[in-house]
Amino acid sequence: MGVWGRRGGVVAGVLVAGVAVTGCGSVDVAGAPVEREVFAFQGRELVVDSVGSDLVVGAGDVEDVRVERQVDGWGVGGSGPEARWELVDGRLRIRVECDGIASGCGAVHRVLVPRDVAVSVTGEDGDVAVEGFATAVKVRSDNGDVRVSKVSGALDIGSDNGDVRAEDGLGSGEVVVRSDNGDVRLSFGVVPRRVDVAGDNGDLTVTLPRAEYEVSGSSGNGDRNIDVPVREGSGRKVSLRSDNGDVTVRTAN
């Protein structure tokens, strides 16, 4: 069933953070109570803005926005973890904060969105996973990995510090990825029209179905490996640029 269960329910235990903190305490998000909230929503695009939590965003057969969270933590000389969520004017705002002289927090939020809604996701200090959208998806991540699966709408990803993975039969016709620090791996299940990937520090790998592509690949400090049929003027354009890392374009078979 993947990240999301039948009837639009959210499957617990997916992308759960569990952080051990030596000497003072431990964080057990998987064992934390599950809290649930349903937010009324009408619109064509949902903005998800998360700080301090891992995040799973998926599309389902629902008419509203459904959120589950698990939060755990500890604090010395403070209040421990404080979690807040609200949906106002099309923006779902998620915050998890630790307060204290010494503290440790961990959290995961799972967000279920109507299938016909596009999403724009911003994650800070946490991993981001997005699954199951046929609509446009935009992801911005600051300090966390990004994982995308079963997405067929236009895809736009920006990552400041973390790996980017879209390897489960990516169906998007147009994909743009910008990465400051981390590897990027894209694996397509359909022939895309446009792929544009640029990275400052990390390997870039794109796996494509067999077809002819117009390919541009360059690296300031790394190997360049182009192993797909290449034809100038093809309507299918692939561009990879890395300042410091290998650049690879290859066929799936």
Roles of regions detected by a PLM:
Residues 22-26, 47-53, 75-79, 113-115, ...:
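Short low-complexity stretches enriched in small and charged residues
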Residues 35-39, 80-153, 164-166, 185-187, ...:
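Right-handed parallel beta-helix
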Residues 41, 50-52, 87-89, 123, ...:
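A generic beta-sheet turn/junction motif
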Residues 44, 65, 117, 213-215:
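Short beta-strand/loop motifs in extracellular/secreted proteins, especially
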Residues 47, 56, 82-84, 110, ...:
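Short, surface-exposed charged micro-motifs
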